[in-house]
Amino acid sequence: MTQINNRSVWFVIGTQHLYGVETLRQVERHGQQVVDSLNRSGILPFRLQIRPLVKTPDEALALCREANYDSECYGIMTWLHTFSPAKMWIGGLSVLHKPLLQFHTQFNAEIPWDSMDMDFMNLNQTAHGGREFGFIGARMRLPHQVVTGHWQDERTLLRIGQWMRTAAALQAGRQLKVARFGDNMREVAVTEGDKVAAQIQFGYSVNGWGVGDLVEVINQVKDGDVNALVDEYESRYVFSAAAAVGGAKRQNVLDAARIELGIGRFLDDEGCRAFTTNFQTLHGMTQLPGLAVQRLMQQGYGFAGEGDWKTAALLHICKVMAGDLTGGTSFMEDYTYHFAPDNDLVLGSHMLEVCPSIASEARPLLDVQPLGIGGKADPARLIFAAKAGRAVNASVIDMGDRFRLLVNVLDAVEPPRALPKLPVARALWHAQPSLATASEAWILGGGAHHTVFSQALTVDDLRLYGEMLGIEVVVIDEQTTLHGLRDALRWNEAYYRLNQR
């Protein structure tokens, strides 16, 4: 596996001067060996960077302050090789704003039965040193994570990698700018929300631009750039007769390419990595952005329709979290049900905007078809079906006094029959634990009709993300019952009201 970028997680070993110079040298050597091994493993998405031993309160404070201001640092991973009195960490942990992982490991995998002496016991104290550090985390109510396991165990490294990706997603959210072209779809409730509260909680900023500002950039795109992009389309997609050279709708494909280039340039100029559109506010645009949005999502941009900035932001964050993992991640909407004995299904889609990262076809179909809403020219779009396999749907909603993240476990399936007259991309799935329970639980929890659909991420990924942020997480999976979910929602309501700051 290739590491994603040059950013890193700091590997910090806590100890104290009590043990003497030679013991501390051994700790340093062990730490370097562990870091080198983990970096060579091919499992971690980001590099571990070893830092000097932390032996005093001043060193702990200085380290945490430095981590906060280092934009290349995703978070801190601590290891208590020896006993590190936790009071010395209070100052540093009080100011730390980066994610914290306690790696509860030890240098030796097994007890050296024949050779273990008091020198060995003096050096290898993770088992109780980690508990001391863990107490101060609990006492300070720190939203931190703990991974236990030997540093040469692949299962342990996979969990560290999961934490790293989530830490990267957290930082991406804190740096994210979301552009809204137009406002929300009129009279829709769930796409509304407190953007100031969201920026305080998640870190991302949401601002609006008039569609005219975007149209001006689109109109400045040169024909040569459009033709070059259409050549790329030709190499990647199968064209319908209408969309092909000489086809009745060829100009619509050229217009879609111009829109893609214009939106991409606008977002890059403004530093935005997520955006929303609204089919009710398209003044000056030739067609509703379909193909353009699909391709921009595949490039990592977050998107949601009808002004839904929460889902657009969540999509970009999830794409960062998915990183190098297998499987795609897309904007999605539950569209229609298939009620059948022992085979209830949900068809998910949207008007046009489903990301081709989830496509089962190597070369999706590029077509131009009429669209009954928006009042514009027939839009270009990619048509495909999602791959079969385990997936999740996720939604962030504004509950007024807090944000709630809902996650439903799904099993995507291959369509049992063709859909020859449906000219949009789609996914078909079994909702866990059943369509009836999943939909009722989702509705009781207030989940949005827009979601992020991911075949790369799991419930554990999203739960970890919610825990890092300190937001409410509601999971609907194979174990969910309606009475249990109702109880959990009531308990959560009490907890978050009592825990308001």
Curated annotation (Swiss-Prot):
Mn(2+) binds at residues 306, 333, 350, 450. It holds the Pfam family AraA_N. Its cofactor is Mn(2+). It catalyses: beta-L-arabinopyranose = L-ribulose. Catalyzes the conversion of L-arabinose to L-ribulose. It comes from the Bacteria. The gene is araA. Belongs to the arabinose isomerase family. GO terms for molecular function: L-arabinose isomerase activity; manganese ion binding. One of its GO terms (biological process) is L-arabinose catabolic process to xylulose 5-phosphate. It comes from Erwinia tasmaniensis (strain DSM 17950 / CFBP 7177 / CIP 109463 / NCPPB 4357 / Et1/99). Pathway: Carbohydrate degradation; L-arabinose degradation via L-ribulose; D-xylulose 5-phosphate from L-arabinose (bacterial route): step 1/3. InterPro entries: Ara_Isoase_C, AraA_central, AraA_N, AraA_N_sf, Fuc/Ara_isomerase_C, Fucose_isomerase_N/cen_sf, Lara_isomerase. Keywords: Arabinose catabolism, Carbohydrate metabolism, Isomerase, Manganese, Metal-binding. This is L-arabinose isomerase. GO terms for cellular component: cytosol.
